[in-house]
Structures are given as C-alpha cells and as structure tokens.
C-alpha cells in the first residue's frame, strides 16, 4: 500500500496541488462508502464484491490506506530537500495529511463501534486480552482526539487564520499521534 501511495503522490503531485478540493471530495465519498460498508458488516449483512473492491475496502477499513498516507507524511519531515523526488513529494505534505485523515475516519468508526458492540464480551475478559482491548481502544480514542485538530488546521483556510507559531506548535502534536498509531499497530 505504501509504495502505491508514494508512486501516486510523486507522479500526480501537480494534480494533487491543483485539484486538492476535488480530491478531498472524492476521498470523502469513498470514506463514506466505507463507513456504510462497515455498518452493513457490523450488522451481519453478506456483501458481494466486484473484483478488487473487497481488498480496497479492507485497505481503508483496516487503516492501511490512511496509515500509508500518514507514513509518507511523517517521513517527509526527514527527506533531504536537495533531491528532486523529496521536493516533489513534500510539495503536497498538507494535502496528503488531509487525505490520510479522511481515509482514517472509516477505520476509526469501524473499530469504535465494533468495540461498543462487543463490550459485553470484553467485560468478561481478564488478564492480557482485557488489557490489550482496553489499551487499543484508549490509544485509538486518544489518537483521534489529537488527529481531529491536526486535520482541521491542515486546511489552508483554517491555517491562514492562525499565526505561524501557533500552527507550528499545534503540529508538534503529530508526533504524539504517530506514537499512538505505533502503539495500536
């Protein structure tokens, strides 16, 4: 998934910058479809898929798609800017971060409701299984709490209303977010 995302980000860098709003809309529609897909799955519906669609939905639902975008965004911070590939990838760091957040929301939604629907079984657990479930849920909720302000302030319209210093200090919370994602993985 990560190699595919890097290739897309590199080869379509100019288009991502130029058509970012349209890409956000398409990404949001796909994410909404994934959330609806999750609702059907959690309610026990059997779904017939077109070839490749099941894997695509699974990539979004599992968090792999959003995670791949976040990995790229995270590593862009250490790219050496003297290389053309680094400059080309980094020119859309904010846009790719927004896309990552949009693709992560279905994953968050699925596992939040799966946890709630499965809470009767989780309370019966003890030891490591209970601790693991509670830790994963807590880390996820904490990560979402950090991700949402970062997501909102990544939009140029919002970012322009903030001072550079305030925006940069808020963006430092991204490192905590990455740590929470690491805990979950």
Language model features by range: what are they?
Residues 1-185:
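Membrane-embedded alpha-helical bundles that constitute the cytochrome b-like, heme-associated redox core
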